[in-house]
């Protein structure tokens, strides 16, 4: 089982947020993984 933190999703906008203890672990552990039949991309948050 893959352990990760709290997950929230945007209102059908194709994005979500995952809370990890370490940014590098989040990117390396989840980038490219299958989530509910979709291949996901994980990167650091960008300010608008």
Curated annotation (Swiss-Prot):
It comes from Populus euphratica. Signal peptide: none annotated. It holds the Pfam family RRM_1. This is Glycine-rich RNA-binding protein 3. InterPro entries: Nucleotide-bd_a/b_plait_sf, RBD_domain_sf, RNA-bind/splicing_reg, RRM_dom. Keywords: RNA-binding. The keyword RNA-binding applies. One of its GO terms (molecular function) is RNA binding.
């Amino acid at each position: 089982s893959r352990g990760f933190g709290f997950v929230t999703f945007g209102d059908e906008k194709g994005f979500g947020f995952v809370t990890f203890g370490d940014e590098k672990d989040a990117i390396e552990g989840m980038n490219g993984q299958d989530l509910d039949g979709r291949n996901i991309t994980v990167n650091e948050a960008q300010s608008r």
